Swiss-Prot record:
It catalyses: (R)-4'-phosphopantetheine + ATP + H(+) = 3'-dephospho-CoA + diphosphate. ATP binds at T10, F11, H18, G89, L90, R91, E99, N124, S125, F126, I127, S128, S129, T130. This is Phosphopantetheine adenylyltransferase. Substrate binds at T10, K42, L74, R88. HAMAP family: PPAT_bact. Pathway: Cofactor biosynthesis; coenzyme A biosynthesis; CoA from (R)-pantothenate: step 4/5. Its cofactor is Mg(2+). It comes from the Bacteria. One of its GO terms (biological process) is coenzyme A biosynthetic process. Coiled coil: none annotated. Belongs to the bacterial CoaD family. It comes from Shewanella piezotolerans (strain WP3 / JCM 13877).
Length: 160
């Protein structure tokens, strides 16, 4: 088990579904880099630094997990990190087509980067950052979907 893997995403915010996949990846690979994407086309609720801190909190118990922000092409970030595996999550069959296209594009850009797909536990399969933000925006309790520190941070954001 000498493989370095990257699990990329926006993580705005990190959910229990993300945490589930991170824990699964940490068992499979020697080192897992959580790559938090800075995507100019998205308007995240949390800054990159806030997302990094929240993910560090959620993954603090995992010795082989590192959290890093990045911008630019994922395949370039993977090369920088000397990663040979790209971890992606599939919540539903509907995710597969898009992920399949991404995997093929990444393979064309970087033939040595292999995509591995993981599925979350059933109780986390419906959770998305978008849904969590929507519930929080309307004053709902999101503590069953995210780490308590993430729930508190979301509540503070919503209160202004």
């Amino acid at each position: 088990m000498h493989t370095r893997a990257i699990y990329p995403g926006t993580f705005d915010p990190v959910t229990n579904g993300h945490a589930d996949l991170i824990e699964r990846a940490a068992k499979l690979f020697k080192h897992v880099v959580i790559g938090i994407a800075l995507n100019p086309s998205k308007k995240p609720r949390f800054t990159l630094d806030e997302r990094i801190e929240l993910l560090k909190t959620v993954t603090a118990h995992l010795d082989n997990v590192e959290v890093v922000g990045f911008s630019g092409l994922l395949v370039d970030f993977a090369k920088e990190q000397q990663a040979s595996v790209l971890v992606r999550g599939l919540r539903a069959v509907s995710d597969f087509e898009y992920e399949f296209q991404l995997a093929n594009m990444n393979r064309r850009l970087s033939p040595d980067l292999e995509s591995v797909f993981l599925t979350p536990a059933e109780e986390n399969s419906f959770i998305s950052s978008t849904l969590v933000k929507e519930v929080a925006h309307h004053g709902g309790d999101v503590s069953q979907f995210v780490h308590i520190k993430v729930a508190n941070a979301l509540m503070k954001k919503e209160q202004g």
